[in-house]
Each structure stands twice: as C-alpha cells, then as structure tokens.
Amino acid sequence: MRKPLLTAALLATAAWTIPVRAQQIDLSDKIRLNGYSNFEFEYMPSKAGRGDGNASFDAQEFDLVFNIIPTDRLRVNADMRWEHGVATEDSRGNAAISHAFAEYTVRDALRLRAGKILLPFGIYNEIHTAKPAIFLYKEPFAVYKTEKLGGVRRFQPRSGAGLEALGSGGLGGVDADYTVLVVNGETTGKKDPFEEDDNRAKSLTARFRVHPASWVMLGTSYYHDQLTEFDATGKDTGRRTRQSSYVQSLELSPGPVLVQGEWARGNVTPSSAPGTDMEGWYAVASVMLLDRYRPYVELQHFDPSRKLANDEVRIVSPGVNLRMDGGLYLKFQVDKYHSLPANTRFKGVDYTELTAAVAVAF
C-alpha cells in the first residue's frame, strides 16, 4: 500500500507546486498574439470562361500569429492558418503552419533564422497570406501564382525548411537590406520537403533591396533548385530538372501615391527535354484618399512559354480598397481576362469576374 500512497502524494505535490511556479513567470511582455482573417466573393456573369459562375462565398482563411520573445536577441515566430472553413472530420479545408522559425539577432546587419520560412522572393511572397497587408484583392498571379494562368510551375514555392541570414543597414549612404535562404527545396516524389530532402541539392533564394530615397524601393530576387526525376517505378534516376527564376521589383510611394511593378522570368529544364521559359509582369498604380479610400488599377501579363506563340494572358483589374475601421478592410475588384488561343488554361476565351473581400487584422 505504501507505493500507491507515495505516488498519490507525489502527484498531489506536483499539482500544488506547478501552478505556483507558473504564477511566478510573467509572460505578458514576452508573448504577442496577432492575426487576420479573409472572406472572399467571386462571380463571373458570363456563361463562358474559367471564373466562378456560381457567385461563391469563400471563408478563405483565419490566421493566428505568435511572436515569442524570450530575450532581447531571440524571437520565435509562427503563423497558424485555417483555410476554407476547415473541418477535418469532413475532409474539408486546410490547416497549416504557414511559417514557424526561431530568429537570433547578432546585430541589425545580421539576423539568423532556422525553421519553416517563407521564401524572400519579390514584394508579396512573404506576406501572401496576410491579406489585410495587401491592398489588392490578391497578390498578382502573373508573378506569384503562374499555374493559375497556364504556367507549368510557379516561379518559386511558397516556403521551405532551412536556414536564413538577413539584415539591413547603410550602403554608401543608402538604406539597404538583404536575405539569403537555403532550404530543402521542392520534392517531386512522396517525401515531405519540410522533413526530408529527396536529393542532396539545396534550394537557394536571395533578395537584395535598396532605398535611394524614403519613397523609392528597388529590389532583385533570385531562386534556384534541382528537382529529382523518377522513373515509372518511383526510383530516383539520378537526373535532375533545374529551375531558376528571378524578379525585379520597383515601388514608388511619394505622398498618397503608391506605384508597384515587378517583372519575373524563369526557366524549368528537364535533363532530357527542352526547357520552358516563362515571363510575367504586373504594374499597379493607386492613391490614398482621405486616409481611407485607395482606388487602383492593376495590369498583369504572363507568357507561359516564350518559345510558343499565342499563349499569353493579360488581366486588367480596376478596384478599390476601403479601410472601414481600424484593421477592417473592404475590397472590390473587377478582373478582365484576355487570353490567346494557345493558352492551355483559358484557350482564348475572354471573360470578366467580379470579386470582393472582407479582410480583418487584429
């Protein structure tokens, strides 16, 4: 009987002491919780086209962002995301960790990260889930979601597991920042790229930006990876498909005016077949009125293969972003799609889609 009594006593002691110790640790200044949500609507009035003819609502995402700061130099950041009304018992929606990393600051010019990290590619990839931070209805597909415009692959994946070095400082009297990220890269087989690579080659992403003036940003980003090629039985052939992409970025923000533009090119080359050269760009001009209304016009162009003719697609999108209250934003945008007959997705069928969103940051 002594052992059960001793066990009970130990459990009682633990139950008594653990809450006391927890009360002695004040984490109020160490943990910060933020988040955002996004609700969307899309409708294509015409009968022909690749838009949504059913006028659908989409509970697009709900995110919680944790910043844990154990010391002045150490930070842990994670974004937990639930998409499309996730319900696991019904196999609906998606739940994911958008990113989760530990960051150690050596100095302003050098911070080190390890974990699951969003690729520092262009203006929007690192913030693509944070819809309240994007005044457009969505990030431009011509650079960030090229598969939706007939591309064989995106210019870059969203994220990867690996190590990152980044920093900021002055360069000849001009503000500048850089980022270099090495991750497992994309896997083309069954392996989880956030757990295990399927070849020895690592993916490299790098970005460099300068600010010649407070209202001017010039940037360039580069991405490279080697993808494993498998045979019909799923065995690694030892051959690799090479992918390289780069994007040039420009942002001008004099006063209430905001102008953004990016131009990207990429190549996907299998070991024993001709490669595919993709090209995409967008430009958007907007103005802030009364610190609340931001009307804008966006133009996108994407060429899925520069070696093929008549496969381009162009999108013209007038819209407006309304800041209603604090972190509450309403977005209205009209997307006018025009494509040429050889485009594998749109096949030359033009159409217009009406879109709207309710984005909240908290």
Regions picked out by a protein language model, each given a short descriptive name:
Residues R209-S305:
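Detector for outer-membrane/organellar transmembrane beta-barrel domains
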Residues Q24-M44, G53-G185, R200-K202, R209-M217, ...:
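Outer membrane beta-barrel
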Residues S286-M288, R292-G327, K331, D335:
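Outer membrane beta-barrel transmembrane domains
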Residues Q60, W82, A96-S98, N184, ...:
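Transmembrane beta-barrel architecture of outer-membrane proteins
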Residues L322, G327, G348-F362:
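Outer-membrane beta-barrel "beta-signal"
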Residues W16-A22:
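Sec/Tat signal peptide C-region and signal peptidase I cleavage site
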Residues E40-G49, R81-T88, F121, V183-F194, ...:
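Sequence/structural signature of outer-membrane beta-barrel proteins
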